[in-house]
Curated annotation (Swiss-Prot):
Pathway: Nucleotide-sugar biosynthesis; ADP-L-glycero-beta-D-manno-heptose biosynthesis; ADP-L-glycero-beta-D-manno-heptose from D-glycero-beta-D-manno-heptose 7-phosphate: step 1/4; Nucleotide-sugar biosynthesis; ADP-L-glycero-beta-D-manno-heptose biosynthesis; ADP-L-glycero-beta-D-manno-heptose from D-glycero-beta-D-manno-heptose 7-phosphate: step 3/4; Bacterial outer membrane biogenesis; LPS core biosynthesis. One of its GO terms (molecular function) is heptose-1-phosphate adenylyltransferase activity. This is Bifunctional protein HldE. Its EC number is 2.7.1.167, 2.7.7.70. It comes from the Bacteria. The active site is at 267. Keywords: ATP-binding, Carbohydrate metabolism, Kinase, Lipopolysaccharide biosynthesis, Multifunctional enzyme, Nucleotide-binding, Nucleotidyltransferase, Transferase. The lineage of its organism: Bacteria, Pseudomonadati, Campylobacterota, Epsilonproteobacteria, Campylobacterales. Residues 350-482 are annotated as: Cytidylyltransferase. It comes from Helicobacter hepaticus (strain ATCC 51449 / 3B1).
Amino acid sequence: MFGLESKSPKILVIGDLMIDHYVWGSCERISPEAPVQVVDVKDENNRLGGACNVVHNLIALNAQVFVCGVVGNDEAGFWLGEKLESMGVDISYLFVDTSRPTTKKTRVIIANQQVLRVDRESKTPIDSHIHNNIVQHLHAVLDEVDCIIISDYGKGLLNDELTHFVIDYAKSKSKLVLCDPKGKDYSKYTGATLLTPNKKEAELATGITICDKDSLIKAGMTLKTQCQLDISLITLSEDGIGIFDNNQIHIIPTRAKEVYDVTGAGDTVIAALSFALSSGCDIFQACEFANVAAAVVVGKVGSAVATHSEILQYIHTQPSNLQQYIESKIISQESLFTLLKDLKQSKIVFTNGCFDILHIGHLSYLNKARDLGDILIVGLNDDDSIKRLKGKERPINTLHNRALMLAGLECVDYVVSFCQDTPLELIKAIKPDVLVKGGDYHNKEVVGKEYAKEVVLIDFIEGHSTSNIIESIQRSKICKHS
């Protein structure tokens, strides 16, 4: 469905690195020293937490990951660095701050119930020496990566100055910047590509109580305007992800079947979004991918990750609303032009036609066209333009039915109709990387070729055409009545 298994984008995660330390035990007595439980420890282990969990999710998706953060000069910091490096993470931008401990959260669990949490951390902002050292070294990796994730847990690393520097420099290089925000003042995230607040965080940041669709749209648009975001979205828990534009909301519904534990789901969402966007997906496809990844994760216990194989298996075993997905691929020209702003890193393939009676020749042609890039857009003649081109008896199938048939093909990403006799104006607006036409255009002028980077002609399968099918049906009728 997504075709991202072979992708391996370079992604930098800058944020608050943590260790989640779990202690499992039993309790059968009270301490004689004080009225408290005595825990007999049976097992304990360390897991990656905070921004490290984002890293873990990216590694599971086969991204090339760089991490920038601060650890203390302690055993926990050594373990964290060694663990990340063993996973293939580039830790060249991991800095040691002797004035602070490595953030470590210890959870004591008895009979599957958390009874105590102990935090070792410092929320003090990093000192100027560490700050300057980070800025000095970050230029090189910011130039190299496709995307930056800012994972802010409010532990002192991401002060206003450092956050502004990362966003401003990255945007000057046309890099994607995704932020998992913290607190109620989002001004330091101004200029980011997108933020991933949940509904409660969006309320806190905007001062808007979200109680219905209108207030949700107001909050989403407020975030977009105030933070000058390219894309505004709010994660909606069991309702999915809301994307906001032009005072409207588009909700990508959740894919979760069963929820066992929501721990780390937000980290999975931002990791999956960054992976998909960096790999050429548009925001709608990226949110769909993130929803599936999150559905896999919440079906597990504890902080977990989702691999490509798990995502594919989940899709194939879920009775999803296929009709809704198909219909979402049929879009207006206005919506398409908005989408194209988010597809700058994708190789766009465009073709067009009437596609009146879909047949094996069409399927072969469209599959070959899709293989030429990342996104295949099919321009579809409306009914009136077909009548002008083919005669008053055509089309056989209406525009709506033809569009649904095309959208039902896995190789087709978007279907957009046009009313003119040729798709010239549409091609001029899209400016595709690849313009595809049928092999019968060898001796014809390809309309709109001057607006495409490349023109590719694909031969049709001999003997397979809509005209042949119609003629065959007509001959059959004549024979039947003679």
